[in-house]
Amino acid sequence: MARLNCVTVLAPAKLNLALDVVGLLPSGYHDLDMTMQAITLYERVVLRRSPYLNLRLPGSLVAPNNKNTAIKAALAFFDYTSLLAGVDITIYKNTPVRAGMAGGSADAAAVLVGMNELYGAHLSMSELCALGAKIGADVPFALMGGTCRVQGVGDFLKALPPVPECWFTVVMPDYGVSTPEAFAAYDRVGSSIHPDCGAQEAAIRAGDLDALCAAAGNALEECSGATDTGAIKALLREHGAVTALMTGSGAAVFGVFRDEGAARAAAQAAKRRWKQVYVAQPDRGGARVSR
């Protein structure tokens, strides 16, 4: 078999169909209960064999540095496999930053999957997820993708059946939200929103989109500081969204639609006020090599 010199990986962004803060763990981290959904909006990551470790972010205003999740993933991979090598990483970002859509986690997952393929390491999904968990809480989900019930700090994942057919319109305001600041605000003021993730899991298993949406919610929404959330939700609902909510710690907000036409009409309306608007469907996978 010929040696691979270059690999391209696609890694889906994620949405939180539900996010509840259950409490605090002994570690001090928040105990979460969530439903995560991969969507057809992808980070594209190209990895090439190299004697050095390099990272490029074409078109990004963020300068590459050792705190980048992609670099952390590469270093974790080399440490775990004891490979004496390098890799050249180019990330073509499509997911907005500080949006609550796990773009950085998707990048890390893409690097782990790509390097596993590039260097023929044959690491299992469980090994990749264990490495990913050391990099970021959402990296294991970015590796698995699809639809998952996620608990703890992101370390307990249960794969669920695909959600019923639907479309998502995602709107990102002109600012981002800091995840630590959002959780700090939650600790100060709490939330009246506590979605029933168990009911949502049952709805997904039953293929019931209405019940899925009825159980949707985000406990961080009221305290995220994202001032456009209410206006975005109202616009999406006016254009037929079954439900609308913030994803993750924000600042992106999305609506769930039954059909593509309504989702795209909502997107066109949103673009009159907000620049970053996306239309996507559920994705049944996670980070994977693009053939």
Report residues per predicted region.
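ATP-binding N-lobe of GHMP and related small-molecule kinases
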Residues: 1-99, 117, 121-126, 163, ...
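Solvent-exposed alpha-helices and their adjacent loops that cap or buttress functional pockets
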Residues: 2, 37-38, 133-134, 140-143, ...
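Short beta-strand scaffold segments in enzyme catalytic cores
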Residues: 19, 44-47, 138-142, 148-149, ...
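Short, basic/glycine-rich phosphate-binding loops at helix/coil junctions
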Residues: 51-63, 111, 205-216
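Contiguous, small/hydrophobic- and glycine-enriched helical/loop subdomains that border
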Residues: 86, 108, 112-149
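Glycine/serine-rich anion-binding loops at beta->alpha junctions
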Residues: 90-119, 137, 241-257
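Conserved, helical-rich catalytic subdomain that frames metal- and/or nucleotide-binding sites
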Residues: 144, 149-243, 258-264, 268-275, ...
